[in-house]
Regions:
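Phosphate-handling DNA/RNA-contact segment within nucleic-acid enzymes
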Residues: 40-134
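Alpha-helical elements of the RecA-like P-loop NTPase motor core of helicases
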Residues: 19, 98, 156
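TOPRIM fold recognition
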Residues: 86, 104-213
């Protein structure tokens, strides 16, 4: 696990980080609200990256060239203010979570209902047991994990532990590996039969509508 020194947490404003998020079709207003900008040193060199805080005070760390974490590693559990929510949506990583919020904002800009439910972000499928512990109090749980073996295993583990309350929503983007690919219009290799590479495109209104949930 990388060692980070001289950590400084700032508001997310660096042009390179915002450009990276824009290229992933992430709504920048949402990104600024949900993430921070981290400046740190590693092996004597200075770096900056997007930070996404977990429930134990650690961070998921991401920029165009690096994906890692600052310990302690844990899930992120986002609870809305006010009355307890009965529903919770589960995502594999921060980019999936940001993609979902961006899709909802695009489809329902005047009333996206982003605070109608709580959210759990695994930050790693190895954290699925921690997620299950956090999900016990919810009546309705929607899993929007990756369409790969690790994502399916994590979804199955949640379904096995929590039963009828769990809905696997990955079929809504079944031709895509994950929610960010869905947002960007990049189909998974299993569903693409053309030889030429597929370009990232801005999603159509119909694509966003599928995740009205």
């Amino acid at each position: 696990e990388p060692s980070f020194e001289r950590l400084e947490v700032r508001e997310l404003n660096h042009p390179a980080l915002l450009r990276y998020l824009s290229e992933r079709n992430i709504d920048l207003c949402i990104a600024r609200k949900e993430c921070v900008e981290l400046h740190f040193s590693h092996n004597g060199k200075n770096y900056f990256a997007i930070g996404f805080k977990n429930k134990s005070g650690g961070y998921e760390v991401r920029n165009r060239f690096f994906k890692g974490c600052m310990s302690p590693k844990d899930i992120t559990h986002i609870r809305q203010q006010g009355e307890p929510r009965y529903a919770c949506y589960v995502f594999e990583g921060m980019m999936d979570y940001l993609s979902f919020l961006s899709l909802r904002m695009e489809k329902f800009p005047s009333c996206p209902s982003l605070e109608a439910q709580d959210y759990v972000i695994l930050n790693s499928t190895s954290n699925v047991d921690k997620a299950i512990d956090a999900l016990h109090g919810y009546e309705r749980i929607s899993c929007l994990l990756d369409n790969d073996e690790a994502g399916r295993k994590a979804t199955l583990a949640i379904e096995t532990a929590l039963g009828y309350r769990v809905r696997d929503a990955s079929h809504l983007y079944s031709e895509y590996n994950d929610l960010n690919d869905y947002l960007c219009g990049v189909k998974s290799k299993q569903s693409v039969h053309q030889v030429q590479p597929v370009k990232r495109t801005v999603p159509s209104r119909k694509r966003g509508a599928a995740l009205g949930m």
